[in-house]
Amino acid sequence: MKDKAAATMEIPEDPGIPKNLERKRPIVWRMIYYSFAVLLLAAFTAAYVTEFQILTHEDVLFSLGLYGLVMFLHLMMQSLFAYLEIRRINKTDLPCSFKKTVALTIAGYQENPDYLKHCLDSCRYVKYPKDKLKIILVIDGNTEDDAYMMEMFKDVFHGDDVGTYVWKGNYHTGVKETQDGSCPEVSKPLNEDEGIRIVEELVRTKRCVCIMQQWGGKREVMYTAFRAIGTTMDYVQVCDSDTKLDELATVEMVKVLEANELCGAVGGDVRILNPYDSFISFMSSLRYWMAFNVERACQSYFDCVSCISGPLGMYRNDILQVFLEAWHSQKFLGTYCTLGDDRHLTNRVLSMGYRTKYTPKCRAFSETPSQYLRWLNQQTRWTKSYFREWLYNAQWWYKHHIWMTYESVVHFIFPFFITATVIRLLYASTIWNVVWLLLCIQIMSVLKSLYACWLRGNPIMLLMSLYSMLYMTGLLPSKYFAMLTINKSGWGTSGRKKIVGNYMPVLPLSIWMAVLCGGVGYSIYMDCHQDWSTPEKQKELYHLLYGCISYTLYWVLMALMYWVWVKRCCRKRSQTVTLVHDIPERLVCK
C-alpha cells in the first residue's frame, strides 16, 4: 500500500537551496554557534550565581546585579533593532506585479458564526486580482454540527465560482477508519480514496472551495488545503476562521516575497478582534502589539522571524510542498505532533536556510480568549509547541544570523532564572526583599511600556506594564506544566462553540500561589522576630513604608486609567473593527 501511495503521490520539484544561503564547512559553523550558545548560557549562569553587584547603595537599600544589567541591555538592543526595522519598512515602498497566484487557505473548527462571517467577508473583499486568488476553507468535522460553516461559506461567496464537498474521511483516513472513529498510524496519504480525487479536482478547478472532512486536528486541515493545491499556485496564505483580514493584507505580503527570492515566508501584524470583552482580552491586545511590533520586528531585522502567525502569514508554495509530508508526520518522543503547526512550518522554512520576515504594513484582527481559563489553556498550548520547536530550531542556528542563537538562549533560560529569583527573594527572611522584588518587576515593566508608548504613539500602551503580573502569576507556572505535559495534544482553544473544560492548568497555578504565599508568610514571620528598634531596622522600615505606598499608588493609578479610559471611553468608541487603511491619524485608541 505504501509503494502504491508513493507511486501515485505527486512529487513536487525541489526548488533547491540558493547557493548564497549555503554556508561552507557547515560542521565548523555548527561548532561555532553551539560554542557561542554554551558560553552565553555559562555567562548568564555565572552572572546570576555569583550575584556580582554593579551598583549598590546601602542608604537606600538598593543594588543592581550583573544579571539585571544584562537583561536590561537585552531589552534595549531588542527595542533598538525593532525600531530600525519598522522605520526601514515604513520608508520602503515595494512594488507588486500582481502576476503571482495566491491560495488563501482558512482552517476552521466549530467557529463562532459571527467571527466566521467576519473572516469570510474580509476574504471576499481582499484587493487582489480574482483570477490570481483562490480561497479555500477546510472544516475539521463533517457532522451536522459543522454544516453551518459550509452554509455560511456558500452564502458569502454566492455568485462566485464555488465548489463544496463533504468528505467522509481525510487524506490519512479511509472510510473504514471513519466509521469506527479510530485514528490511523500511517502518515502517508491514501491516494486511492475517491474523496481525494474529488477534493483535488475541486481545489484546482474552482476559485472558492469549502471542504468538510473527518475530524483530524488543525494540522490535518491545513495539510488538506496544501496537498490539494499541489504545485498549481505560487504562494500560499494561511488564515484562521476567526480572523478578519485587512483588504491589502495579501498584496503587502506578496510584495515582500517578490522583493527577495531568498525570503521563504512573511507574516503580518495581528491585532485583537475583541479587545474590550474583558481585562484578559484587553491585556492580550497590548501583548500582541508588543509581540509583533517589537519582538518579531527585531527578529525580522535579522531575517529570522521565529514564528509566522497562523492568522496572517504567507509561504512560497514550492518550498512548502518540499517539506509538506515531513511537516505533517512530525513526531516528538514517538508521538505525532498536533500542536505548533505554524511554528513548525516556520522552522521548516528556516531549516532550508530561507529568510523569514515581518511586515507591519498588512494587518489582521483575530479573536482571543476573554475568559481566564481559556486564555490559560491557549498559553499552555503555545508554550508546549515553543519548547518542542526550540529543540528543532537549534539544529539550524548556524544557517542564520547569530542573533537567532542569542535570542533563543535568552528566551529559554529566562523563566528558570525568574523562578529562582522569586523563590530566593521570598524566602530571604525579610519583607523588604518582597517589596523590592515587586517594585523591580513593575519598574522594568513601566520602562518597557514607556518605550512602547513612544514607538506606537499611543499612551494606552502604558497599561502594558500590568501584564507582568499576569506573567508572574499565570504564565510562569504554566510553562512548567507545559513541559511536563508536552506530548498531550488537541485543538485547545480553537473551538469557540464549546466551553473549555480543561481545568488541569489550574493545578500548577495553585501550587505556585502556595509557594508565593508561603514565601511572603515566611518573610513576615521572620521579620516579626526581629528587633525593629535598631538604626538599620528603622532605615529598612522607612524604605518599606515608602515602597509599599509607591507600589499601591501605581496600582491605583493603573486601575483608574483602565477603568476610565478603556472601560468607559475606548469601549464606547470601538463598536466596529478598524483595519489598517481605515485608521485616521487623529484617533486616540489605535
UniProtKB/Swiss-Prot annotation:
Gene3D superfamilies: Spore Coat Polysaccharide Biosynthesis Protein SpsA, Chain A. It catalyses: [hyaluronan](n) + UDP-N-acetyl-alpha-D-glucosamine = N-acetyl-beta-D-glucosaminyl-(1->4)-[hyaluronan](n) + UDP + H(+); N-acetyl-beta-D-glucosaminyl-(1->4)-[hyaluronan](n) + UDP-alpha-D-glucuronate = [hyaluronan](n+1) + UDP + H(+). Residues 1-31, 82-401, 447-456, 527-543 are cytoplasmic. Pfam families: Glyco_tranf_2_3 (PF13641). Pathway: Glycan biosynthesis; hyaluronan biosynthesis. It is found in: Membrane. The keyword Transmembrane helix applies. InterPro entries: Nucleotide-diphossugar_trans (IPR029044). Disulfide bonds: none annotated. Its cofactor is Mg(2+). It is a multi-pass membrane protein. GO terms for molecular function: hyaluronan synthase activity. Keywords: Glycosyltransferase, Membrane, Transferase, Transmembrane, Transmembrane helix. GO terms for cellular component: membrane. The keyword Ribonucleoprotein does not apply. Belongs to the NodC/HAS family. Catalyzes the addition of GlcNAc or GlcUA monosaccharides to the nascent hyaluronan polymer. Therefore, it is essential to hyaluronan synthesis a major component of most extracellular matrices that has a structural role in tissues architectures and regulates cell adhesion, migration and differentiation. Also able to catalyze the synthesis of chito-oligosaccharide depending on the substrate. This is Hyaluronan synthase 1. It comes from Xenopus tropicalis. The gene is has1.
